[in-house]
Amino acid sequence: MVEQRGLTEQFEIASAATSTEEIWNGKGNPIYPPAQAELKKHGIGKTAYTNFAGKRARQVTKEDYHHYDYLLCADTNNIRNTERITGADTEGKIHLLLDYADELQEGSQLQTKNKSSNSISQTISRRGKSIADPWYSGDFTQTWNDVVAGCKGFLNYLKNVHKI
């Protein structure tokens, strides 16, 4: 998204784990093959900016807190672990990614039926929600959709607040 919008010079984007589960003897694992397949399906990895061939897992550090303006987390466990590793979030940098996502819109709304069988659409807020974890569901597409929604919302937030 950043590359598509011509904003690569304004961003430094990194990914880091909050645990060492994917790091063995000081070396991180590469991106999980089904996750790589999902990324490739959406054209990620085709450019120098999005190339993830050499990407390996690493754990977030205290230095990351001072280096980056925002630390965006997939779930509340990640927030707790990030705060434990980096110290107190005194600058308000640590957030849930989906807190920036728009509410679920037409076509992805929850559909329910009332007792008279009339369909009712309900808009659902994503604020405070976790990104779908494919480790448990195997659904990398839902995870992709959640991450995209959060990233789009975050870019819109930066556009409105920081005028990027």
Protein language model regions, located:
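Conserved active-site segments centered on acidic
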Residues: 1-68, 158-164
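A structural signal for well-ordered alpha-helical scaffolds and beta->alpha junctions
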Residues: 28-32, 75, 151
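A short linear-motif detector with a strong N-terminal bias
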Residues: 50-52, 73-76
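Phosphate-binding/catalytic loops
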Residues: 70, 76-164
